[in-house]
From Swiss-Prot:
The keyword rRNA-binding does not apply. NDH shuttles electrons from NAD(P)H:plastoquinone, via FMN and iron-sulfur (Fe-S) centers, to quinones in the photosynthetic chain and possibly in a chloroplast respiratory chain. The immediate electron acceptor for the enzyme in this species is believed to be plastoquinone. Couples the redox reaction to proton translocation, and thus conserves the redox energy in a proton gradient. The gene is ndhC. It catalyses: a plastoquinone + NADH + (n+1) H(+)(in) = a plastoquinol + NAD(+) + n H(+)(out); a plastoquinone + NADPH + (n+1) H(+)(in) = a plastoquinol + NADP(+) + n H(+)(out). This is NAD(P)H-quinone oxidoreductase subunit 3, chloroplastic. One of its GO terms (cellular component) is NADH dehydrogenase complex. It comes from Morus indica (Mulberry). Belongs to the complex I subunit 3 family. One of its GO terms (biological process) is photosynthesis, light reaction. Its main location: plastid.
Amino acid sequence: MFLLYEYDIFWAFLIISSVIPIFAFIISGVLAPISKGPEKLSSYESGIEPMGDAWLQFRICYYMFALVFVVFDVETVFLYPWAMSFDILGVSVFIEALIFVLILIVGSIYAWRKGALEWS
Protein backbone atom coordinates (compact mmCIF):
# COMPACT_ATOMS: atom_id res chain seq x y z
CA MET A 1 0.00 0.00 0.00
CA PHE A 2 2.43 2.68 1.19
CA LEU A 3 5.99 2.40 0.05
CA LEU A 4 7.45 3.84 3.24
CA TYR A 5 10.30 1.36 3.32
CA GLU A 6 11.77 3.04 0.23
CA TYR A 7 12.13 6.28 2.15
CA ASP A 8 13.52 4.92 5.41
CA ILE A 9 16.72 7.01 5.16
CA PHE A 10 14.61 10.14 4.66
CA TRP A 11 12.36 9.30 7.61
CA ALA A 12 15.34 8.50 9.83
CA PHE A 13 16.96 11.83 8.92
CA LEU A 14 13.68 13.69 9.51
CA ILE A 15 13.13 12.08 12.90
CA ILE A 16 16.73 12.58 14.05
CA SER A 17 16.83 16.19 12.85
CA SER A 18 13.57 16.86 14.72
CA VAL A 19 14.53 15.08 17.94
CA ILE A 20 17.96 16.71 18.39
CA PRO A 21 16.71 20.34 18.66
CA ILE A 22 13.77 19.32 20.86
CA PHE A 23 16.15 17.37 23.10
CA ALA A 24 18.53 20.37 23.26
CA PHE A 25 15.69 22.70 24.31
CA ILE A 26 14.52 20.26 26.97
CA ILE A 27 18.04 19.85 28.40
CA SER A 28 18.65 23.62 28.44
CA GLY A 29 15.30 24.20 30.12
CA VAL A 30 16.08 21.66 32.83
CA LEU A 31 19.72 22.60 33.45
CA ALA A 32 19.59 26.38 32.97
CA PRO A 33 19.51 28.49 36.11
CA ILE A 34 16.28 30.38 36.64
CA SER A 35 16.94 34.00 37.49
CA LYS A 36 14.43 36.80 37.29
CA GLY A 37 15.28 40.39 37.88
CA PRO A 38 16.29 43.64 36.19
CA GLU A 39 19.43 42.13 34.67
CA LYS A 40 17.42 39.37 33.03
CA LEU A 41 14.95 41.85 31.58
CA SER A 42 17.55 44.28 30.20
CA SER A 43 18.39 44.30 26.50
CA TYR A 44 21.62 42.61 25.45
CA GLU A 45 23.74 44.12 22.69
CA SER A 46 26.64 41.76 21.91
CA GLY A 47 28.00 41.88 25.45
CA ILE A 48 27.97 45.67 25.65
CA GLU A 49 25.58 47.68 27.77
CA PRO A 50 23.27 49.61 25.44
CA MET A 51 23.60 53.37 25.52
CA GLY A 52 20.29 55.18 25.48
CA ASP A 53 17.31 53.64 23.77
CA ALA A 54 17.81 50.08 22.54
CA TRP A 55 15.78 50.73 19.39
CA LEU A 56 18.35 52.58 17.31
CA GLN A 57 17.93 52.98 13.59
CA PHE A 58 20.62 51.57 11.35
CA ARG A 59 21.92 53.37 8.31
CA ILE A 60 20.18 52.49 5.05
CA CYS A 61 23.40 51.16 3.49
CA TYR A 62 23.23 48.13 5.80
CA TYR A 63 19.72 47.31 4.63
CA MET A 64 20.63 47.77 0.98
CA PHE A 65 23.72 45.61 1.32
CA ALA A 66 21.67 42.90 3.05
CA LEU A 67 19.01 43.08 0.35
CA VAL A 68 21.57 42.69 -2.43
CA PHE A 69 23.10 39.75 -0.55
CA VAL A 70 19.70 38.05 -0.23
CA VAL A 71 19.04 38.49 -3.95
CA PHE A 72 22.31 36.84 -4.92
CA ASP A 73 21.86 34.16 -2.27
CA VAL A 74 18.47 33.26 -3.76
CA GLU A 75 20.08 33.28 -7.19
CA THR A 76 22.56 30.67 -6.00
CA VAL A 77 19.77 28.54 -4.56
CA PHE A 78 17.93 28.58 -7.89
CA LEU A 79 20.96 28.09 -10.13
CA TYR A 80 22.65 25.26 -8.22
CA PRO A 81 20.03 22.55 -9.02
CA TRP A 82 19.95 23.75 -12.60
CA ALA A 83 23.73 23.42 -12.86
CA MET A 84 23.62 19.91 -11.40
CA SER A 85 21.12 18.71 -14.02
CA PHE A 86 22.37 20.81 -16.94
CA ASP A 87 23.03 17.86 -19.26
CA ILE A 88 19.56 16.36 -18.71
CA LEU A 89 17.33 19.41 -19.16
CA GLY A 90 17.96 20.85 -22.59
CA VAL A 91 18.16 24.10 -24.50
CA SER A 92 14.87 25.67 -23.39
CA VAL A 93 15.84 25.49 -19.72
CA PHE A 94 19.25 26.92 -20.61
CA ILE A 95 17.55 29.91 -22.26
CA GLU A 96 15.30 30.40 -19.21
CA ALA A 97 18.32 30.31 -16.88
CA LEU A 98 20.14 32.75 -19.15
CA ILE A 99 17.19 35.16 -18.98
CA PHE A 100 17.15 34.75 -15.19
CA VAL A 101 20.86 35.56 -14.94
CA LEU A 102 20.47 38.54 -17.28
CA ILE A 103 17.67 39.95 -15.10
CA LEU A 104 19.92 39.56 -12.05
CA ILE A 105 22.80 41.26 -13.85
CA VAL A 106 20.53 44.18 -14.74
CA GLY A 107 19.41 44.33 -11.10
CA SER A 108 22.99 44.33 -9.83
CA ILE A 109 23.96 47.10 -12.26
CA TYR A 110 20.94 49.10 -11.06
CA ALA A 111 21.95 48.57 -7.42
CA TRP A 112 25.52 49.55 -8.23
CA ARG A 113 24.42 52.74 -10.01
CA LYS A 114 22.11 53.67 -7.13
CA GLY A 115 25.03 53.30 -4.71
CA ALA A 116 23.68 50.32 -2.78
CA LEU A 117 27.08 48.63 -2.81
CA GLU A 118 29.04 51.60 -1.44
CA TRP A 119 29.68 52.18 2.27
CA SER A 120 30.45 55.88 2.12
